[in-house]
């Protein structure tokens, strides 16, 4: 928490911790627990006498992995990929710590199928599909076809979205207002086995909050409390481009926006051709360097 508030230790509370559910799937079993712990915290280096309690939901999964392992690749910090750590114990005198790249094993016969929550409204589904289509254009150029496939939750009674080994895009009915994505990875190789993407109910809250103070002076669409669904869908498409990138093993690339100069970001010709950042893995959602009058000239916002 910015270095001011630090968790020193946690003491599990067995009386208020319990097993919530146990599920069996085709190739794995999952146990979900509600775990409560008392925290010892320090504020600016001083240990507090208060011990607040924290309750979290923890899912533990045992999966049957394929005997055929994907070839590993050593991670390099100069390349924008995700990674997992490993320790090589084969040398008894000196252990070796290293990092594997996290990546998908994508072929024309092995697409990446995402099952999307049927609670997500149709306009948002179209925005998400647009993001998948943008990625598929790249794969088509590589001769892999269109490997990212979006399907609605199956109506079959055997389908369960909480299966940790399938790719899902879920509608999150919580206080979060950001799109989230996390991968389930084969720790032996770094192969990404599945991805869970969450689309929050309160996405409009984030769009409005960031849009008002970054874009209200430039774009009249943000000068209202109720943001138009069209604007939310544009924002969702940009967020999902990054989420799909994370699901493929790419890392956040905050240097993407540093590649363009302020002059370029105010140029209609440049922004229409190259967009507002050099990487979809950036966190930039708005062209907040634009000035009043730039939109009318054709600058992409």
Model-based region annotation:
Residues 110-112, 144-146, 191-192, 276-278:
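Loop/turn elements at helix/coil->beta-strand transitions in domains of secreted/extracellular proteins
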Residues 121-124, 156-159, 177-178, 201-207, ...:
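Flexible loop/turn segments at secondary-structure boundaries
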Residues 1-120, 138, 153-206, 211-228, ...:
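Auxiliary tRNA-acceptor-end handling modules of aminoacyl-tRNA synthetases
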Residues 256-301:
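Conserved catalytic/binding loops enriched for acidic/polar residues
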Residues 121-128, 132, 229-237, 274:
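Solvent-exposed, acidic/flexible segments
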Residues 133-136, 190, 234, 238-253:
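Active-site recognition of the HExxH zinc-binding catalytic motif
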Residues 119-147:
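Zn2+-dependent metallopeptidase catalytic core
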Residues 138-156, 253-254:
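Short, well-structured beta-strand/strand-turn elements
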């Amino acid at each position: 928490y910015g270095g001011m508030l630090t968790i020193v230790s946690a003491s599990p509370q067995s009386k208020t911790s319990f097993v919530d559910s146990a599920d069996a799937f085709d190739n794995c079993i999952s146990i979900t627990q509600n775990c409560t712990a008392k925290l010892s915290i320090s504020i600016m280096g001083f240990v507090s006498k208060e011990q607040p309690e924290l309750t979290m939901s923890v899912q533990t999964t045992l999966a049957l992995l394929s005997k055929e392992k994907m070839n590993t690749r050593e991670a390099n910090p100069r390349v924008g990929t995700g990674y997992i750590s490993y320790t090589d114990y084969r040398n008894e005198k000196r252990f070796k710590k290293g990092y594997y790249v996290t990546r998908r094993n994508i072929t024309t016969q092995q697409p990446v199928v995402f099952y999307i929550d049927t609670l997500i409204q149709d306009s948002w589904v179209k925005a998400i599909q647009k993001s998948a289509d943008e990625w598929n254009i790249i794969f088509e150029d590589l001769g892999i076809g269109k490997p990212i496939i979006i399907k609605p939750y199956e109506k079959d009674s055997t389908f369960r979205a909480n299966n940790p080994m399938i790719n899902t895009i879920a509608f999150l009915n919580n206080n979060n207002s950001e799109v989230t994505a996390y991968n389930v990875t084969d720790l032996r190789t770094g192969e990404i086995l599945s991805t869970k993407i969450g689309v929050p109910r309160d996405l409009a809250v984030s769009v409005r909050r960031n849009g008002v103070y970054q874009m209200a002076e430039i774009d009249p669409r943000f000068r209202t409390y109720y943001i138009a669904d069209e604007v939310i869908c544009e924002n969702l498409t940009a967020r999902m481009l990054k989420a799909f990138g994370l699901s493929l093993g790419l890392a956040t690339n905050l240097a993407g926006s540093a590649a363009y100069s302020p002059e370029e970001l105010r140029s209609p010709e440049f922004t229409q051709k190259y967009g507002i950042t050099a990487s979809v893995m950036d966190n930039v959602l708005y062209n907040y360097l634009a000035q009043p009058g730039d939109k009318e000239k054709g600058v992409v916002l």
